[in-house]
């Protein structure tokens, strides 16, 4: 039976990514959820490949993500748009992680999303998931600083 190792920073990053999506799952429309699932799938697949122009491709996709989320939010700049934008950019940042040093910005972005979600959404499930993200981020940063 496989054991869950909370000090494995790659596993923590994936769990934080899933929790980040689940925080906003109930607060966005179906079309935005479909876009997030596609972006999540892309992030997981791209992280597994290592090719030369990964950051360039992610940058182009980030610009497209900003535009697509703007259109999905009825071309309105609102707090929902910016919180959705943070989640989209977290997905793209996860796909760019290659080295241990790249995990720091990802962890801080997840904490920012969790705190923003706590301010924006006050339901119990969202608050619990935000707490899980913050707790996992602390464990994640601790495991990144460990030397073996």
Predicted regions and their residues:
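Linear, non-domain "peripheral" regions
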Residues: 1-148
């Amino acid at each position: 039976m496989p054991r869950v190792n909370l000090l494995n920073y790659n596993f923590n990053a994936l769990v934080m990514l899933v929790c980040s999506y689940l925080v906003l799952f109930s607060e966005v429309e179906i079309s935005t959820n479909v876009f997030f699932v596609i972006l999540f799938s892309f992030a997981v697949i791209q992280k597994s490949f290592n090719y030369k122009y990964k950051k360039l491709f992610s940058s182009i996709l980030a610009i497209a993500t900003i535009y697509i989320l703007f259109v999905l939010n009825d071309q309105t700049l609102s707090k929902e748009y910016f919180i959705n934008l943070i989640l989209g950019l977290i997905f793209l940042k996860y796909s760019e992680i290659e080295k241990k040093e790249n995990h720091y910005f990802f962890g801080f972005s997840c904490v920012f999303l969790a705190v923003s979600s706590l301010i924006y959404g006050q339901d119990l499930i969202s608050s619990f998931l935000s707490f899980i993200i913050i707790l996992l981020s602390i464990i994640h940063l601790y495991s990144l600083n460990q030397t073996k």
